Amino acid sequence: MSIILGIDPGSRVTGYGVIRQTGRHLEYLGSGAIRTQVEDLPTRLKRIYAGVTEIITQFQPDMFAIEQVFMAKNADSALKLGQARGTAIVAAVNHDLPVFEYAARLVKQTVVGIGSADKVQVQEMVTRILKLSDKPQTDAADALAIAITHAHSIQHSLHIANSVKMTETQEKMTALLKTRYSRGRFRLKI
């Protein structure tokens, strides 16, 4: 069982979503947005840090997943986004959480099945996947999608690890049987 905190960073609105993963089962724990209405960037970053810290304290997540920076048309916007993202990551690291990063395109591909999905499609699929009665706000839905992507990544990694272990076990058994058969310990009955 793991509790995953997903973050959709923004300098004005930072979405968050928290889920619990038990095997393949995902359970919604909470979501929302940290809104920073002040004008100066340092105060916004301070509020993002405080907000993420409060969420970590409240939900006690085991893992922290965040969207990677994408290339924006406006360099100033990209820099502010990077600073907001860094602030959220520092809050996670200060609580000894492992940090995982996912590209927006991968998140959309994982949750919707299309890497170019829009916010409404992501919102709809998050609502279905987590069996929510109401649609979360778009920033929270994006953060939940990031958490879902991380949960999917964990499942995929476990599947691969189990496959590797199974292959190694099969190889060891085959080698053992070949050794014993060649020594005459086993006889094939036909």
From Swiss-Prot:
Cofactor names: Mg(2+)
Molecular function as annotated in GO: crossover junction DNA endonuclease activity; DNA binding; magnesium ion binding
CDD domains registered for this protein in UniProt: RuvC
Keyword Heme set for record: no
Pfam family, one: RuvC
Enzyme type, top EC level: hydrolase
PROSITE patterns, per the entry: RUVC (PS01321)
Residues at the active site: 8, 67, 139
Subcellular location: Cytoplasm
Gene3D superfamilies associated with the record: Ribonuclease H-like superfamily/Ribonuclease H
Residues the entry annotates as binding Mg(2+) 1: 8, 139
NCBIfam families membership: ruvC
UniProt name for this protein: Crossover junction endodeoxyribonuclease RuvC
Gene name for this UniProt entry: ruvC
